[in-house]
């Protein structure tokens, strides 16, 4: 059986695969993600299509250099008409949380499988995230509690920890919110001979 490789630096994606009992190695793709996003936007691609394109680019990049089946994954946050990138500072995080307060945004999680530089499969799932109204005092307390670790998450939250306090409704798959729609991915891995038994 060929090795399984995760082409992502995401700790949450790695944790999901580990918790699912998969043996894999992590080899993050060295890509200019902003350039891929900008190219997709220039072509008029939807946010969901951009998430797929990012996942495919990561999987193809790593699979061209390393033998095995490679999982690429990426997540795009759509707020109104904008695609949101990770905040680079706590001030940017505060501004984003203020902007998201009382609004609904969408997480589009793309995933792809590639082997030997050839795409095997790709897909994306979406989740609708309704943020409750957040007071400035709550935002400050939240950022103080989470610290700068929150800058590693595109929406400045991790649903599996303190981030759950931001929401009053979520529609969509939990794994999609965490950045890797696990059930369709596991089905494809079984199709390619990767399973527990």
Task: Mark where each language-model region is.
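N-terminal polybasic phosphate/anion-binding patch
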Residues: 1-69, 83, 137, 144, ...
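Alpha-helical membrane segments and adjacent membrane-interface helices in multi-pass membrane proteins
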Residues: 69-75
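Active-site-adjacent loop/tail segments of enzyme domains
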Residues: 75-105, 131-133
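Active-site oxyanion/phosphate-handling segment shared across diverse enzymes
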Residues: 122-196
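Residue-level signal for inorganic ion chemistry
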Residues: 17, 55, 74, 93, ...
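Anionic-ligand binding region
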Residues: 110-122, 126-127
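Short beta-strand-to-turn element immediately C-terminal to the catalytic PLP-Schiff-base lysine
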Residues: 78, 112-115, 132, 169
